[in-house]
Amino acid sequence: MTQFFYLLRWNYLRQKDLFLLFTLAQVLLSISLLFGYPLVIGEIDTTAAYYLSSGSVLIGIISIGCTISSPVIANAKSEGHVDYVRALPVPRILISLADLWMWMIAILPGVFISVILGYFRFSVRLNVSVLAVFILFLICLTMISLGFAIAYTFSPNIVTLMSQLILMIGLMFSPIMYPASRLPDWINHLYHVLPFVPSVNLLRACVYSHGPVSFFDFTILIIWILLTQLLILRVLYKEK
């Protein structure tokens, strides 16, 4: 555990200046979605309010967990930081865990502020419970793991392209800010095996008590966490 906390502290000291920027980016993105989308949609009913509130939170998580974390990690990899850490006499799995926890700490303040902004904007019902907090942690972990897996697996140029593509898919096409019933069935089937739609479904069900809690959605997130962590550990344990 001592090694883990030293790694965590080291990661924090390397990137502490980014923490405030992460929170600011999430808050500004949430404000733009919460106040901008209604200008396009027009009158907001109860269902739309829950979709916009939960969607703005998830888009903020995606923006930091996938879109920003991937280039940051890819840049650290190209600068030799990953090779240096791998050479340290610490278990490789602790390297991954320390990175994940550091980014979790960085992303959570913006998440909670985004939830509060949605509450004040639309007066939606919030479910303050252990399950709600756990689901928020799980969603953050899923998106951060996905961002890390992309950064560790691909070259920096591909990482930049994929991170932007993920945000565009999440913001423009995924049924995150609107009901999935508006899309063709075959697209819905595809989106339900990706982590984004299951995440927002669980977010609405557990944090906002809007809709049922789906074990299938929960399973999809667990599978994505396991797959992405296997990819990360494969790179960390790979001998050059």
Q: Where in this protein do the model-derived segments appear?
A:
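Transmembrane helix segments
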Residues: Y37, I41, A151-V193, V197
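Hydrophobic alpha-helical transmembrane segments of multi-pass membrane transport proteins
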Residues: L29, A49-G118, L165, L171
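Short alpha-helical transmembrane interface motifs in multi-pass membrane proteins
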Residues: L18-F22, S54-G55, I62-T67, L97-M102, ...
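Short hydrophobic, aromatic-rich alpha-helical segments embedded in or entering the lipid bilayer
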Residues: M1-R9, I176-D217
